[in-house]
Amino acid sequence: MDVEKENYKEKYGDVPTPYFLIKEMLELIPNNLFENSHNKWLDPGCGEGSFGKQVYEQLMFNQIHIVDINERRKTILKNLFLLEKNEYYEEKIKENIGDDMFDSNIIITDYLTWEPNIKFDVIIGNPPYNSGGLKKTPTNKVLKKEKDGETLWIQFVKKSLENLKEGGYLCFIIPSIWLKPDRAKMYEYFTQYKLHKIKCFSNTETNKIFKNNAQTPSCFFLLQKVKGDNNTLLYDKCYKTYMNYNFKNSLPIPVHGVFLINKLKPYVEKYGSLEKMVIKTNSITIRIKVNKEKTDKYIHKNVTTCVLEDNKASLVINYSDNPCNYAGKMKLIMAHKMYGFPYFDEFGEYGISSRDNYVILNEDYKRLLRCQQFLSTKFAIYLFESTRYRMKYLEKYVFQFIPDIFKMEDLSLCIDDNVLCDYFGLNEFEKEEIMNFNTKPYKTFVK
């Protein structure tokens, strides 16, 4: 192991980008940009210069109109800028992209304080995600939270948009968390511009791509600095191609299953979404005390979470001295943090004593039962993957993609995967994709 390099990774958030991924990102960029010898290119956090090397090679291939090889090299190097904060990488950058005959724009400086006197046509790269320490994630068992790093990729994105020409292009790979509209407002920041294409990777896929050096869902994209139109092309893993997706009205951008979300969209527009029926629970008030065991004082039953035991969903229960929220009400309780696994609390037997569970209240027994059946299918599990913005958590945003089942009069009261696939018009290929996506034989609470 290169100990010095590992220390740089932890200190500066540096994770090398594999060449196959760089190649795929470059394929997003319109070919005419590589042909224009006047365009200026920038990698603002170039590390060893991997992006710069492939951009250089692509420019050399595309700019054959400059017949003289040396003149072509000189022109390209004049317009290709590689920035890196850490002197540690300088020699490696020169090895990858430097040319003894011509000057190279290899600049060792802090990008966030750099003030160039030019604007760029294309900015591309893998910006550092953090500085001053790795970001703590649920799968990072070593790092302590108090040593958590400062997120940098947001600053790099904003700085890069400032440094782009009007109409210029930004192509980065960054965490996927901006794809949901939240308090950070990065969704709004991105969608004000034209998003041409986006390809997303789960936390598992990201970790594999970066050889166990990255632990968060990620995406790469091609953005143009022109007014956005609420449309983009999302990569669909089922069809292995990019599909159109419209995100008007601040609709979240899914990280998975765009073909299915597009199938459901007309029903969401007709019936509304299930989101308004779903309540995300908060922590209980300090006035309520809880205990693991039932005693004379602690008599009120509550759900804290749901776990899997040999693929069987099982509620985790505690007891409180006073009733917790939602006790005494007929409801669905989705307490499993990844798959929900709705429990039908017909008689209001349970309160909810912990945060980040989901509750659906309704007094119509048959429709609530139908909703439980829907949300327990492989169809639903496939949908839940669409909003895995933070590791593998079940996000409330997914319910914006699901039509309001309570209003769908023509939907069978007895639901399974076959019923749903037929109702929403899925073909055999799509049905097979859903049925084979997760093959574990989960035993849910559906009777």
List PLM regions with ranges.
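Hydrophobic/aromatic beta-strand patches that form the interior of the parallel beta-sheet core
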Residues: 42, 81-83, 107, 171, ...
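Class I S-adenosyl-L-methionine
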Residues: 1-96, 100, 399-445
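Conserved acidic residues
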Residues: 39, 121, 331
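Signature of N6-adenine DNA methyltransferases within the class I
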Residues: 10-11, 17-23, 45-53, 77, ...
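C-terminal substrate-recognition regions of SAM-dependent nucleic acid methyltransferases
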Residues: 8-12, 205-433
